[in-house]
């Protein structure tokens, strides 16, 4: 058993690919969660201000004076967008987990069959 059969090598490669995708997805999800928390915090703080209070919003490296209500509306839209993105990432994460479990079961089955053949074949294809 010096070398794994191509089918098992392929399954291992697929599992590694799914693991890499899951890791990238987790990083994206963490970033979106952080942005959502920041946006929620800004929204909550802005709600505490009086109507008509001077408000500034960032535009690149600039701070621009804006209407409080407009900024609240913008923050609400951002929150909604981040929520949608987070739900989408969670669904992708579930699909990847399902795919990983499926590949893992296939690999276990293939390895079990390979071990079941034992050394009787001498590792040669006939």
Swiss-Prot record:
Keyword Cytoplasm: yes
Oligomer status and interactors: Heterohexamer of two alpha and four beta subunits.
Family per record: Belongs to the prefoldin subunit beta family.
A GO molecular-function descriptor: unfolded protein binding
Keyword terms of this UniProt record: Chaperone, Cytoplasm
Compartments it resides in: Cytoplasm
CDD domains reported in the protein's UniProt record: Prefoldin_beta_GimC (cd23162)
GO cellular component, one term: prefoldin complex
Transmembrane segments: none
UniProt superkingdom: Archaea
Signal peptide bounds: none
Any one Gene Ontology BP term: protein folding
Organism: Methanocella arvoryzae (strain DSM 22066 / NBRC 105507 / MRE50)
UniProt cross-references to Pfam families, sorted A to Z: Prefoldin_2
Name listed for the protein in its UniProt record: Prefoldin subunit beta
Chain's role: Molecular chaperone capable of stabilizing a range of proteins. Seems to fulfill an ATP-independent, HSP70-like function in archaeal de novo protein folding.
Keyword Chaperone: yes
């Amino acid at each position: 058993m010096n070398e794994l059969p191509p089918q098992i090598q392929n399954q291992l490669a697929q599992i590694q690919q799914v693991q890499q995708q899951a890791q990238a997805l987790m990083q994206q999800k963490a970033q979106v969660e952080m942005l959502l928390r920041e946006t929620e915090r800004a929204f909550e703080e802005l709600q505490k201000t009086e109507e008509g209070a001077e408000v500034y919003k960032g535009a690149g490296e600039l701070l621009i004076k804006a209407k409080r209500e407009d900024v609240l509306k913008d923050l609400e839209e951002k929150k909604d967008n981040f929520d949608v993105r987070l739900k989408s990432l969670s669904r992708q994460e579930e699909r990847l987990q399902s795919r990983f479990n499926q590949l893992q079961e296939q690999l276990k089955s293939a390895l079990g069959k390979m071990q079941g053949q034992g050394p009787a074949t001498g590792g040669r294809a006939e």
